[in-house]
Amino acid sequence: MKKRSAVMLSSVMLMSVVLAACGGNNNTASNSASNGSAGNSGEVKTVKVFQFKTEIVEGLNELKVEFEKEYPNIKLDIQTVGGGADYAAALKTKFASGDAPDIFSNGGYAEMELWGDKLEDLSDQPWVKDLIPLAAEPMTKDGKTYGMPMNLEGIGYVYNKDLFAKAGITETPKTITELEEAAKKLQAIDVIPFGNAYQEWWLLGIQGISVAFAQQDNVDEFISGLNAGTATIVGNEKFKDWSNLLNLTVKYGQKNPLTTDANTHLAMFANGETAMMQEGNWAQTLVDNITPDMNIGMFPMPINDDAAMNDKLSVGVPANLVVNKDSASKEEAKTFLNWLVTSDMGKEYIVKKWKFIPALSTIAATPEDIGLLGADVWNYVQEGKVYGLQASKFPDGVTQEFASSIQELIAGKVDEAGWEKGMQAGWDKLKK
């Protein structure tokens, strides 16, 4: 559902539906010069950036050129490990080998705690006061800010509106029963309802399973209980519900989901072979690259027949950029981060090139800027119909354990009881 009227993504709007507002004034790129960068001295320094968002690689490399024109004494070395690769393992290898980056990605919450002894306090940076509260939360501890959120993202089912209309589906499903009814209607017009990239561990172990956690009565208490041994995944109703959804997508999906990667399911969707895929609003640019101006939208993943509970989208910060406190180039790293969110060039790339939902109140965007998917996500945020993303609260390595257990369930190697036990065993092995 595309809104034609311009929308300012501001903290004032978010205040009414999520948290109390935080104020902020516009900054300019000139602020960054006050951070002690090498830009005004003769010394040339290199800032090594190690991040995982593969969909922004082209844009980052273009911004690197523009930034280095403005700051000729700062050179950016940008490396990306993402997609199907294990970024967390690669980051640990970087630090262990003595090739630690100056800027790297961090998911916040438990991941912030894990890397706490490497994180520079960024509380004094000019952009901090402009953070939207929802976006600031994952990297805030004891009133201090340790990371710059790249954007807000929503995760759900991306769907082809034209195929839905052709199949006679007039409303997006809000229950698992309605979802199956929609799938049957799509099959009736010879369209594969779901494209499932279940080869991808992150799609299952980070994004998909987040819904089963988010729908707990109190997710933070549940996670604390898992760590303390007072709560369990085994026999938990929400996990059974989620497995029912998983089985439904396999039943109405393409063949061989466990050997289908994200690029394939994106291509199948963009070419009209499938009507739905589990994705986030970052898929907008990826779909546009294959089929420009495709009529698409997003809705939450319903795991049962509680329409009110299911009509909430998983929304949060996918990644924060943090600064290595031991870096010899940390002031230059701060200069780049500030430039990224305060310069006209940086802000343009954030909303127009990457179609990001901004995490700062000083970055304006319209639905036309952020695309149909971003506009749908923002509508859920405005209406207060959101669940937070949960994976950053998990013990390190659990997401891969989860994915392995889920893939065993899909393959039929375990039944539901065995799957739940496998999920619990993965948590117990890695909890602290």
Locate the predicted segments by residue.
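Short, solvent-exposed loop/beta-turn-alpha elements that line the ligand-binding surface or hinge
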Residues: 121-137, 214-241, 289-291, 303-312, ...
